[in-house]
């Protein structure tokens, strides 16, 4: 997949922040006289952009990716990271306000020249910011600036908010239509995209590009960014409006996406997000490291249109897996990092304990469709292998125009949660021993797989003494038995234990489903899990 190369390049700049540099080559006098936007004024508003995107969809796709000069095309990630934007040329430096914008240099695999515009909201006019080497500092790089001829454009941008102006960015748009944001920890994690096309289809996946951005100049005391974007690809175009609120504990983006299909699209992904899951409490296949867990996200959380809450722990499967969860007008979904305890990761480099979650909240009626989940095998943490998005049920035909409104919440945990008990953790290991522990003198006579699902919250700690807790478990193949319900005082909840036994030689994934209830009252969200049985000759103990 091209996904691997693109995401690997993105990972290389994960630590790249807009740190101010000294000894810059750029001219301070030039910045004071004109600012970064140096183009001619032209009329602009969102309605005009929507018309432009619609008209563009009616014409043949033009690939505008450029051939970069050798000094940029062959550069290493370290060299790319060493290029610094000159903070004195930040887009709104002269405003002396609460917000600012800086730009990423083109280089490595970032060959799409992205055009940037500054918008005056009072006159509704826009002026382009043209690339020129004077905007950047190349002091600690091997870049030959003599090769930087003409307007190369930019690769993307990053947003800053006081009091960290010119120090630590809070939002980053870089590569294709990828973008990310931080929460209170200041740590980047998973990514979102403007659009996904044919992620799991019979043809090769397509990665649309944001090719132009417009930044609405804020008032001096404003604390919200308004950014417009034009998206282009062989199959679709789009006009986007992002209202970005960088709050103290989270970043909230309100997205208005108008999408136009150039061609029929087999699989259209709305509000796509990309993450990484290598290993966790239940999946240890690729965890032979010093770290107990390695992941940006540990679960897909879904709040269905009918009100049901679902927790689907993520996997790092041996083979690619795709699952579609049908729904109508979903209330929300997201890839969530629920565990933020350092001890459970022991990571002082990538800080997985600080990674944010990403939650999607539809603000328009999305109708029928499915929340799709793609899990790709990965051998390490530098390759993102988890993708989730919404796919409309109605086929997308050439000439179709669609509008989706939604909010994106980048925060430690989603802004909403089930009032019922929620899944705290999932664990899996050797089963078949009814003693409740692994006997030291013998192995169980029959092979089985044990699962432990912990539930917490939802008033479980306030249930009357003697309340009967009933686990309701179903499986798509095999059988489940040997149930135990244990009180966990540490989390003020319960642990449900059960064993799965095969009843045939199938190695197809087994879909497990569990919730707990008392009498006829549901007590928890629904746990969904996909288990991959070993081959029949592996279903034995030593």
Swiss-Prot record:
Pathway: Glycan metabolism; osmoregulated periplasmic glucan (OPG) biosynthesis. Disulfide bonds: none annotated. InterPro entries: Gal_mutarotase_sf_dom (IPR011013), GH-type_carb-bd (IPR014718), Glucan_biosyn_MdoD (IPR023724), Glucan_biosyn_MdoG/MdoD (IPR014438), Glucan_biosyn_MdoG_C (IPR007444), Ig-like_fold (IPR013783), Ig_E-set (IPR014756), TAT_signal (IPR006311). Transmembrane segments: none annotated. This is Glucans biosynthesis protein D. GO terms for molecular function: carbohydrate binding; catalytic activity. Probably involved in the control of the structural glucose backbone of osmoregulated periplasmic glucans (OPGs).
């Amino acid at each position: 997949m091209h996904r691997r190369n693109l995401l690997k390049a993105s990972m290389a700049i994960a630590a790249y922040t807009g740190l101010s540099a000294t000894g810059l080559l750029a001219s301070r006098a030039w910045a004071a006289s004109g600012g970064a936007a140096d183009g001619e004024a032209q009329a602009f508003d969102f309605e005009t952009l929507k018309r432009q995107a619609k008209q563009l969809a009616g014409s043949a796709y033009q690939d505008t990716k450029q051939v970069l000069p050798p000094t940029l095309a062959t550069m290493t990630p370290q060299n790319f990271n060493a290029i610094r934007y000159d903070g004195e040329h930040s887009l709104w430096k002269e405003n002396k306000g609460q917000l600012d914008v800086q730009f990423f240099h083109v280089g490595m695999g970032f060959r799409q020249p992205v055009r940037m515009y500054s918008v005056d909201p009072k006159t509704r006019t826009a002026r382009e910011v043209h690339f020129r080497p004077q905007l950047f500092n190349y002091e600690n790089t091997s870049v030959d600036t003599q090769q930087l001829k003409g307007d190369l454009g930019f690769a993307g941008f990053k947003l800053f908010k006081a009091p960290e102006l010119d120090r630590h960015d809070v939002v980053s748009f870089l590569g294709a239509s990828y973008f990310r944001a931080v929460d209170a920890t200041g740590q980047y994690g998973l990514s979102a995209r403007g659009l996904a096309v044919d992620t799991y289809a019979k043809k090769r996946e397509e990665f649309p590009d944001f090719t132009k951005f417009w930044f609405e100049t804020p008032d001096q005391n404003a604390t919200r960014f308004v950014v417009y974007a034009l998206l282009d690809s062989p199959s679709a175009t789009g006009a986007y409006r992002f209202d970005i609120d960088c709050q103290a504990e989270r970043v909230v983006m309100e997205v208005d996406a108008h999408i136009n299909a150039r061609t029929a699209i087999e699989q259209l992904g709305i509000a796509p997000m990309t993450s990484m899951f290598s290993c966790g409490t239940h999946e240890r296949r690729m965890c032979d490291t010093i770290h107990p867990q390695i992941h940006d996200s540990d679960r897909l959380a879904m709040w269905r249109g009918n009100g049901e809450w679902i927790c689907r722990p993520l996997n790092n499967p041996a083979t690619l897996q795709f699952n579609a969860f049908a729904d109508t007008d979903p209330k929300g979904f997201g890839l969530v990092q629920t565990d933020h305890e350092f001890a459970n990761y022991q990571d002082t480099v990538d800080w997985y304990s600080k990674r944010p979650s990403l939650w999607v909240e539809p603000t328009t009626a999305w109708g029928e469709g499915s929340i799709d989940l793609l899990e790709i095998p990965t051998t390490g943490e530098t390759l993102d292998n988890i993708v989730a998005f919404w796919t409309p049920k109605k086929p997308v035909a050439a000439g179709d125009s669609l509008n989706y409104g939604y909010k994106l919440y980048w925060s430690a945990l989603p802004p909403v949660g089930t009032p019922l008990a929620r899944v705290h953790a999932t664990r899996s290991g050797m089963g078949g021993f009814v003693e409740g522990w692994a006997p030291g003198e013998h192995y169980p006579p029959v092979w089985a797989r044990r699962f432990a699902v912990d539930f917490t919250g939802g008033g479980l700690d306030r249930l009357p003494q003697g309340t009967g807790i009933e686990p309701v478990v179903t499986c798509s193949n095999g059988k489940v038995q040997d149930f135990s319900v244990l009180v966990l005082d540490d989390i003020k909840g319960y642990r449900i234990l059960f064993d799965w036994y095969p009843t045939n030689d199938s190695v197809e994934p087994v879909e497990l489903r569990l919730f707990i209830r008392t009498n006829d009252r549901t007590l928890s969200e629904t746990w969904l899990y996909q288990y991959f049985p070993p081959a029949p000759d592996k279903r034995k103990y030593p």
